[in-house]
């Protein structure tokens, strides 16, 4: 396990670690396998890399638009960064992509708001969420705006992120080598279930941990607009 702020410094060096932490808190709750579906949500989130990849592939095959990973990078942004689904679920690679998107938003915002660092940063949060400098400031009755949620998470207590551990040098005789044990595969790992009437949430919703991940037969909602973030249904996308 690696402290998030350490990981952010290494993988997203162009964004202040606590700023990245606030976005990640709102986007995924520090879940590297999170998937947010536009127009719906998963009944439960994937619990492993294999399940997350399979879920993403199934959603793509059915025509759904979604964001994925710890910083919730939209699927349509992956080709721009040469990323596969497997790489997008890697916390470091996902943070790197997310930070590049936020950095681009901030650079454009500060040009429009010279000398207003914090104002430009908030505009960048809106851009990260909605693809523009205004959508992230919109509120709904009883719910704060996306920008307000991120700002409120500025002092969030970060969670450690699981990574491949550092090797420890030990005498050969003391380093026991065991054959890998074949793990039992998650039930119905080849499909996902999408709830077409999700409740309003600020991050991908999680259901019962033991519920199978399936895909309903209903067709996804279509949109004429370019991919953009919409966090009103527990989905955050670019």
Swiss-Prot record:
Signals that turn on the gene: Specifically induced within macrophages by phagosome acidification. Induced at 37 degrees Celsius in minimal medium, suggesting that nutritional stress is a regulating signal.
Extra facts: Transcription of the operon is maximal in early exponential phase.
Region Disordered: start-end pairs: 197-238
Organism listed in the record: Brucella suis biovar 1 (strain 1330)
InterPro entries: Lysozyme-like_dom_sf (IPR023346), Transglycosylase_SLT_dom_1 (IPR008258)
Keywords in alphabetical order: Virulence
One Pfam family in the UniProt entry: SLT
Keyword Metal-binding recorded: no
Alphabetized CDD domains for the sequence: LT_VirB1-like (cd16892)
Biological role: The VirB system could be required for the establishment of the replication niche in the host.
Family the UniProt entry places it in: Belongs to the virb1 family.
Recorded superkingdom: Bacteria
Name assigned to this protein: Type IV secretion system protein virB1
